[in-house]
Amino acid sequence: MSDFSFSPFESISGYILQPLNNVMNTTVSGLSSAISAPLNLASIIFIFLYGYNVMTGRVALSMNSLLNNVVKIVIVTTMATNADTFNTYVKNIFFGDLANAIGNALNSNPSSANVFDYILLKTSARYQEVLAAAWFLEKIMVGLLGSLMIMAVIVFCIGGFIVQMFAQVALVMIIGLGPLFISLYLFNATRKFTDAWITTLVNFTILQVLVIMLGTIMCKIILYVLDGTYESIYFLFPPVVVISIVGAILFRALPGIASALSSGGPYFNAGISSGGQIFTMLSSGAKTGRNAAKSAASTLSGAAGTATKAAKIGGNGRGRF
């Protein structure tokens, strides 16, 4: 498995993203065509009436203000009604170029595989090495601990992959509706919807970038652990499992961090809340186990008392015969 030819996450990503890309292109093209005629007509009427009022002195504005408004209208109309221009300046930048550039800058994998594929396959390869070096009877314990270790890494990779796919699917829906929300910028009453659309677009773009950054960081940490020299899997198992659990918690906190970054505020409660929820889950499990043990103990004590009474009754009965 050292050639990293098996890439499950990369394959699944390809199956998902290709239809999404087609849907986004179709949606952008359809919306641009649908709003082209009414938006161009409204822009022409607005420029004509606004310019007429400025030139006749009915509106106290300078020609510079008129030119600025005309330039804004031309830019918004071009972005909203021209699908090729929209794809060049919005779709390609936020959906592909930005994430790919950051991923290429951070990702130093010696293969072209997805970062989660690289982590999973590297862990599996190291597990095979430790299993091959174990003696015969130890292979059972090595196989058990190695399977648990790989399961922890799989949970970590699946968690990160789900967050990444969530960000990309959300970006497809947001970018697909871009021409409509951009056209709303022309009117003061609907400009707030365009501002909200831009904030949401930046939010999920940051989320996608954070997934790439965290995946790369955790990849380097896990690979640093795996590249060490271990005489037994007992020394390899704890750090890999702990790092995988911490990584899964951090992936769960990424949407909140991205939302805080897009709004300009710090976010320190995500990891604490996630850890608190896990602690609550574990404590609830412990309480459930304790209650089950108490119930079993009370049942056993009740059965023992019943057996004692039955023995006494049986003894009394034999005495009367």
UniProtKB/Swiss-Prot annotation:
Disulfide bonds: none annotated. It holds the Pfam family TrbL. Induction: During the interaction with the intracellular environment of host cells. The chain crosses the membrane at residues 30-50, 59-79, 142-162, 169-189, 206-226, 231-251. The type IV secretion system VirB/VirD4 is a major virulence determinant for subversion of human endothelial cell (HEC) function. VirB-dependent changes of HEC include massive cytoskeletal rearrangements, a pro-inflammatory activation by nuclear factor NF-kappa-B, inhibition of early and late events of apoptosis, leading to an increased cell survival, and, at high infection doses, a cytostatic or cytotoxic effect, which interferes with a potent VirB-independent mitogenic activity. These changes of HEC require the T4S coupling protein VirD4 and at least one of the effector proteins BepA-G. It comes from the Bacteria. Belongs to the TrbL/VirB6 family. It is found in: Cell inner membrane. The gene is virB6. The keyword Transmembrane helix applies. One of its GO terms (cellular component) is plasma membrane. Keywords: Cell inner membrane, Cell membrane, Membrane, Transmembrane, Transmembrane helix, Transport, Virulence. This is Type IV secretion system protein VirB6. It is a multi-pass membrane protein. GO terms for biological process: protein secretion by the type IV secretion system. InterPro entries: Conjugal_tfr_TrbL/VirB6.
